[in-house]
Amino acid sequence: FAVNVQAREHGWRLPEHYSTSWEPRLDYNRDEPAHPFRPYGVTPGHGLEWARLTVQLRGALINRSMSVPDWMLEAAEHIFEQARTDGWRVDGAPGFVYTTDFDGKPVVHERMHWVVCEGISASAAIRQALLDDGRGEIDVEHYEHCYRAWIDYAEEFLIEAPGVWTHELDRDNRPSTRTWAGHPDIYHALQATLMARLPVWPTIGQALAEGRLDEPNSLLPARASKPHRRGFFGRA
C-alpha cells in the first residue's frame, strides 16, 4: 500500500498522513511544517527508509521461498531516487532537507542526522540486493557513489566524537534545535554503520547473532531481475 500504491500514485513521493479511511491528507499540518512527529508534506528520509524496508521484505520472501512481487526491487529504486533527487543538496548546501512539498520544493531546510543515516542504509541495502540478483558492478555504481558521499557528509558534519552524532543541523550545517533538542536516538546511526557489512536478510540482530558480520552476500542462489538504467537513454 505505502510503496506500490501511494508512492507510485504520487510520483514516488510518499504521503505521510491519512484519514481514518486511508485517504491521503496532503495538506495536513501545512501551518506547522516542522512538527517533530507529523510534519507537513513529504519527508525524503522516509522515502529512503521505505526503499530499504522494501528490499529487506523482498529478501525475507526470497529466503522463505515465497512469491515475490515483480514490482518490489524496481519500486525501491524509484522511491530511493526520488527521495535523493528531492532532498540531497537541493538548496545549495550539502545535506538532505527535512521536508518538501509534493512538487519536490524544500519546505523545512534543517538537516536531521537520521535522514542521511537512512540514505546510507538504503544505498547499501539496494546495492546488495542487486548484487544478490546477479547484477554487475555497473548496476550498483550509483548506490556506491551515494553511500560514499553520504558517509563523507556524516563524518564532516554530524559525527562529533566516536559514537556521538549531532541530531539536527540548520540549512548551513550548523547545530540546530528547531525540531529536536539533545540526542533522542541512536538506532539510525547504528544501522548506518552496520548495513553495508551485513546481508539484506535476515534482520540486523539475527544476522549478527548468526555471525554474518562482514559476510553480506546472500546464501541463496542469484535471481534474475530486469536492469533499471539511468541517464540520457532512460530505462533499458
What is each PLM-predicted segment?
Residues 1-236:
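Glycan-recognition and catalytic cores of secretory/periplasmic carbohydrate-active enzymes
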